Amino acid sequence: MAQIVKATEAVRSFSDIINRVYYKGESFDIQKGNNIVAQITPVENKSSVKVKNLDELFKNGPHLDPEDAEQFMKDVDDVRRSTRINIEELYRKWD
């Protein structure tokens, strides 16, 4: 059951509230006037994948079909080309 906290108190105790949500799994309803206007609750679907299991996840996980994979690589290349820094141009700016 969520604890009701007035908005003013939530502002003053925000760090404590976040820590209680994160470490203790507590939930809070934030009240402004007579209305509940927000909720702060733990995220329920935390990732349970460990780094040591990433290889297995990538091997057995979902894959793109060949057309989508090709388009994805084209998109990545486009981003790389568009964000490349021209070193000579950069130096000219400092002259």
UniProtKB/Swiss-Prot annotation:
Superkingdom of this protein's organism: Bacteria
Keyword annotations: Toxin-antitoxin system
Described purpose of this protein according to its UniProt entry: Antitoxin component of a type II toxin-antitoxin (TA) system. Partially neutralizes the RNase activity of cognate toxin VapC.
Name the UniProt record assigns to this protein: Antitoxin VapB
UniProt organism field: Rickettsia bellii (strain RML369-C)
Source species taxonomy: Bacteria, Pseudomonadati, Pseudomonadota, Alphaproteobacteria, Rickettsiales
